[in-house]
Amino acid sequence: MSSGLSLERACAVALGIVASASLVAAGPCDIYSSGGTPCVAAHSTTRALYSAYTGALYQVKRGSDGSTTDIAPLSAGGVADAATQDSFCANTTCLITIIYDQSGRGNHLTQAPPGGFNGPESNGYDNLASAVGAPVTLNGKKAYGVFMSPGTGYRNNAASGTATGDEAEGMYAVLDGTHYNSACCFDYGNAEVSNTDTGNGHMEAIYYGDNTVWGSGAGSGPWIMADLENGLFSGLSSKNNAGDPSISYRFVTAVVKGEANQWSIRGANAASGSLSTYYSGARPSASGYNPMSKEGAIILGIGGDNSNGAQGTFYEGVMTSGYPSDATENSVQADIVAAKYAIASLTSGPALTVGSSISLQVTTAGYTTRYLAHDGSTVNTQVVSSSSTTALKQQASWTVRTGLANSACFSFESVDTPGSYIRHYNFALLLNANDGTKQFYEDATFCPQAGLNGQGNSIRSWSYPTRYFRHYENVLYVASNGGVQTFDATTSFNDDVSWVVSTGFA
């Protein structure tokens, strides 16, 4: 017993040394290693997760010419070099194509392939995330997270060193606590290698959202739960654990870990405070979860069978070998808090003023007499001038409102149909009455940025940041720069998505 206590004391001292060091002196994976449960996968687009790491964090691909570049930390153990991305992606769009594994095992995450469910891209692949949808700062330095709309997913089916069978593992992720939905399943962690549902207990991943089809926690969600396949679990029961609280933090630390007939859910505000344990105990009482049958693939943003209806934002996360101690995880949480995650501006370009009336002029050559307008519920472009009828002027005028889903962006209310807003539905822009739902708020929230063609603004969907207001055959869509839809055509994209904002006609 005395030797065990000595070992425990030694580990505690080692952890104390690591935790008390500066951000660069000890990253999360240094702390896990000191605790005897090293990272076998370490993913982040915002910072290095090892104090000595200087390699690539992620790769972006730009729409203008299809070229790629890697984004590394500013210094060893530091924050991502967002300026390199901003320069590389200037006047075009960029997607995150690879999230590199910092552990040295090569467990990189790339575009998820089809499985039990197809993704929306060509050949059933999932979408890639926009490189600009989730700007943040860490200790005042700008970085970008991974904003994942429904249909977006990353995967590695040939991971090295991850837990299989009933082997022990831990994992954490830092997420946006305000970006979620009830669809299946916004996950990060261990999944099937086949992209299909191979049975109970074949997954062990962090889930975040307010899905109630399987398990749930206290209140109405969202919750941190574990996706163990054929069930989102909040505790021992396959249904409800009142000890698993609804989350309201902007930045969330989510923790799941599991070993033989033992697992745990923990969580915290990633910007302050310490971890709380929401469940720690035996495996779920339903059949198939003791022992577990983990397969060792890694997923992000999707379910194990490529269920891809969920949404969320990922900043950083790791998977470990072995079952981390609470003390180790507490030190990791302290490091996350020390990183000082904070929100950053979602907009750029000519400023919009809430309460003002605006009109939006097309900048595409040959169409510059046209303005964004509506005809009933259809949003389109029409030729408008000072001599147009009052009715047409009103149809082409929009009141700027604070973003219904995110106050850092904007919503656009019709001048001639008060209470109705521009929203996207199946990627067409429509004018619909505000029904007060979370879905409508998200569909009707847009973030202006400096115009991609150098004129005015390009207006990006908050909920689908790869997509922008675009006129195509005089009808409005939220379009991506290349894609499976006809209105995603790359030809004249930058011009078609750039709009000059003027004082409203009405």
Curated annotation (Swiss-Prot):
This entry's Enzyme Commission designation comes to 3.2.1.55
**Signal peptide interval:** 1-26
Instruction: Tell where it localizes.
Output: Secreted
Site residues, Cis-peptide bond: 184-185
A single GO BP: arabinan catabolic process
Task: Region ABD: list its residue ranges.
Answer: 344-506
Annotated Gene Ontology MF terms? alpha-L-arabinofuranosidase activity
Ordered alphabetically, the record's keywords are:
Carbohydrate metabolism, Disulfide bond, Glycoprotein, Glycosidase, Hydrolase, Polysaccharide degradation, Secreted, Signal, Xylan degradation
* Taxonomic superkingdom: Eukaryota
- InterPro entries, per the entry: A-L-arabinofuranosidase_B_cat, ABFB, AbfB_ABD, AbfB_ABD_sf, ConA-like_dom_sf
Membrane-spanning ranges: none
Q: A Gene Ontology CC term for this entry?
A: extracellular region
Sites carrying a glycan are 91
Query: Which pathway does the database say it acts in?
Result: Glycan metabolism; L-arabinan degradation
Binding residues annotated for substrate, in chain numbering:
227, 230, 304, 424, 426-427, 443, 471, 473, 476, 496
Write out the ranges of the annotated region (Catalytic): 27-343
The cysteines covalently paired via disulfide bonds are 29-39, 89-94, 184-185, 409-447
UniProt note: domains = Organized into two domains: an N-terminal catalytic domain and a C-terminal arabinose-binding domain (ABD).
Membership in a protein family: Belongs to the glycosyl hydrolase 54 family.
Q: What function does the entry list?
A: Alpha-L-arabinofuranosidase involved in the degradation of arabinoxylan, a major component of plant hemicellulose. Able to hydrolyze 1,5-, 1,3- and 1,2-alpha-linkages not only in L-arabinofuranosyl oligosaccharides, but also in polysaccharides containing terminal non-reducing L-arabinofuranoses in side chains, like L-arabinan, arabinogalactan and arabinoxylan.
Protein name, UniProt field? Probable alpha-L-arabinofuranosidase B
